[in-house]
Each structure stands twice: as C-alpha cells, then as structure tokens.
Regions:
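C-terminal helix-rich "cap/oligomerization" subdomain common to oxidoreductases
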Residues: 1, 65-68, 76-78, 274-327
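N-terminal Rossmann-like dinucleotide-binding module
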Residues: 1-48
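Beta-loop-alpha module in the N-terminal Rossmann-like domain of NAD(P)-dependent dehydrogenases
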Residues: 51-101, 105-118
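A contiguous active-site-proximal alpha/beta segment in oxidoreductase catalytic domains
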Residues: 84, 107-167
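Rossmann-like dinucleotide-binding domain that binds NAD(P)(H)
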Residues: 167-237, 288-292
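C-terminal substrate-binding/catalytic lobe of Rossmann-fold NAD(P)-dependent oxidoreductases
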Residues: 214-268
C-alpha cells in the first residue's frame, strides 16, 4: 500500500527532487505547504494535493489526518524549507506522528541534535536526512577501495567547489548566515559529510579565507589531509559561465587523481528515499559529524596557514585554470 507524504517548502529549488522520489518509490503526495504560492509544479505529480500557504493550517490538517482512518494519515513529512526552519518542521512532523526525511543540513546548530533524538525516542518515529553523495555509485566504489588500504596511510585531497550565484543569493535567506548557516553549511555540508565519510574524523581544522562569497581552509582527517575551497563567486569558475549554461565546478583530487562523479546525480534522492523506506536511512548519528564541523568552521577566525593551503590561495584568486594555477 502506498504511503502518504507531505512536504514543507514545496515552492523551493530542492523540492522537485523530493516530489520525484516520492512518486518513483510508489508513494503519494497528499499535502504541502509554502508561504509562496507559485506551486503549479504540484500538478505534475497529482491534482489531489492539499496546499497550505500557512504552516499553522498545514499543521492542523496533518493533525486531523492523524486522528482519522489509518489509510489517510501522513506517514512521512519531507522537509525542503529554508535551513533555519528545519528543526521546527522536524518537530512539527514528529508531533503529528510522521517520520521525517529532511534536506541537509538537518539543523544549523549542533546543540539541537540531542533534543531531536529525545523526540525520536518519545514518538517512536525516525528522523532521516538527505546525504545523497553517500549513495552515489562512484563514491561508494571509492570508499570500498579506500577501506581496503592501510588505515595509517594519509591521502592528499584537494576539494574545489565553485557555483556561480547572482545578486539574488545575497539578499535571500541563503545569503544570511543566521538563516542558512553560511557558506560552509549551505553549499559545503554535503561535501564535508563526504570527506568525513571517506576519510574519518577531524584531528585539526584551520580556516584560511573567510569572506561572504568565499571560504577556504585545511582539514587534517584520520586518513587524509584536505585543502578545501568553496565559492559562489562567478570569477572563481575555471571557465566562462553564461546565464542558462553550466555554472558549477566541482573537483576532488585524491593523491593527485581526479575523482570523477559529475554524472549520476539524477536519481540520488530516489536512492535515499529507498534506503529510508527500507529502514536504512541516514539518521542523526550520521549527520552529526558534518554539522559539528561546519559549525566549527563558521565560528573560526581566518588564520595564517600553518601548513598547506589550497592551490587557489597559493596562486592568487584570479586567472586560474581548473587546478588553481595561473594561466
């Protein structure tokens, strides 16, 4: 029997991936909420979705369904709202007897994780989060190869992620550190989670560059030394970007070899949903290390590098090719 899903933040950028995953796992969307009412996308999935611009009426609707016949109640709430609302919307879902599938970051501040675990125990419902890079076939294969190597070996890793964003980004909630968690959280958390999953926990962390649109630093992990760089500045792309064309560059070099994972992103959310429905979702314990790390990065001052710096910083931030070298 199909399960019933509800979605918060349904008008946002990420929600179509969740709507597709709900459909492709054989389940049905019954309710959605967003303060913005440009939600015609719902008709691509169902004409029977109850939509509420007010979160209070959405909450009331879920409560009424919970008190009705079992086949009508909401079994899962998918949370696609802005980062600073995730914690509150997780609590709303649990209060209404639903499991949770929450976009990353699960929360902005790590001290909110323990209360959510208490709510899991109280309600008997699980909180899962979307760590989609952990289900990417190429990255699963890489982890298998790394796990077969001597654990004492330290890999050299260079992470570069630049994604062009216009002026809108800075005035939206995404450009507000209080509401998004800042650059390291909003665009970096899935990459930091990947690094921790592949190479183990943090022994040392330094921030070498801290600007509203750029950050860079160094991580010493259990099995890797990582030089990282994040940016929403179009000038940091190693190619000329035009509106409507490719605007993102991601590169991970492991021991000098490029990790190729640019393909295979189309169904990762569906794979995450399949894991959740099989009882194998990524929970609070999985999400905690990266949330703690980005909180530490967000609150750390930029310091003069005591060790290795990202190639972009070594070469300067202009006239770069894909390896951070001057052309």
């Amino acid at each position: 029997m199909p399960l019933n899903f509800a979605v918060t933040g349904v008008a946002g950028y990420i929600s179509p991936r969740h709507l597709t995953a709900i459909r492709d796992t054989g389940n049905r969307l019954v309710a959605a909420t967003d303060p913005h009412d440009s939600v015609g996308i719902l008709d691509q999935f169902s004409f029977d979705v109850r939509f509420f611009p007010e979160i209070e009426r959405f909450d009331r609707h879920l409560d009424k369904l919970r008190r009705g016949p079992e086949e009508n109640r909401v079994h899962y709430v998918s949370i696609c709202s802005p980062n600073y609302l995730h914690d509150a919307h997780v609590r709303l879902a649990l209060r209404n007897g639903a499991g949770v599938i929450c976009e990353k970051p699960l929360v902005i501040n790590p001290w909110n994780l323990d209360p959510l675990q208490e709510l899991e125990r109280e309600t008997g419902k699980a909180i899962s989060t979307v760590l989609q890079l952990r289900v990417h076939p190429a990255l699963i294969a890489l982890k298998s190869r790394l796990d077969m190597l001597p654990q004492a070996h330290k890999h050299d890793v260079v992470l570069t992620y630049a994604t062009a964003r216009g002026y809108w980004y800075r005035v939206s909630w995404k450009g507000s550190e209080e509401r998004s968690g800042g650059l390291a959280t909003n665009i970096g958390i899935h990459l930091f989670d990947l690094l921790l999953w592949l190479f183990g926990g943090v022994d040392q962390s330094e921030v070498h560059l801290k600007e509203p649109r750029r950050m860079a630093g160094f991580l010493e992990l259990k099995r890797a030394n990582v030089r990282w760089f994040l940016s929403t500045n179009i000038d940091d792309l190693p190619f000329t970007a035009q509106p409507g064309s490719r605007t993102t560059y991601r590169s991970i070099l492991v021991d000098g070899k490029e990790l190729e994972f640019t393909e295979g992103f189309t169904d990762l959310h569906t794979r995450v949903y399949q894991r959740v429905l099989a009882g194998e979702g990524f929970g609070i314990t999985d999400a905690r290390p990266s949330i703690e790390l980005v909180y530490q990065i967000r609150n750390a001052p930029a310091v003069k590098a005591s060790g290795e710096m990202h190639p972009y910083l070594v070469a300067g931030l202009s006239h770069k090719n894909g390896k951070g070298e001057r052309k």
